[in-house]
Amino acid sequence: MKKEIIISGFGGQGVLSMGKILAYSGLMEDKEVTWMPAYGPEQRGGTANVTVIVSDERISSPILSKYDIAVVLNQPSLEKFEPKIKPGGILIYDGFGIINKPTRKDITVYEINAMDKAAEMKNSKVFNMIILGGLLKVAPVVSDKGVEKALKKTLPERHHSLIPLNMEALKEGAKIIEEVK
């Protein structure tokens, strides 16, 4: 198993954190992983993306031109990365902020209304964990247990009390992701 994933959106949406949690989850499950962030000079509001590769075998290069899975959280990311998904790949997008929907017919497209779910949960900071839950439902590259271990590793100890909320958000994401026909 080898999955090459790009996650992209605006800075402040938790894109890099989501990628880091995914990568650490793979490490916790003894998988080979790479995590390669890219972002503009802005801390919030600029574009950010992260490439994560999770594999059972050695990874030759973290630099990719095509992806198995793209998670896009804004219109510029959709326009940039939809053409870079391999035929037969997966595109996941949050319905909030996407005006022109994906058009490719040779990939499987999923919509997840994570922004709405985060508002319902009364915590906008779990947005990225809702997205990650949806991703792991359609492409289970790591387990929930791996994610929980990764949260313990990546979150400062003073924030460990937030792990149950993050795990709840992960489960909610798995419930609300839907394939677009």
Predicted region positions:
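Active-site cofactor/cluster-binding pocket
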Residues: 1-181
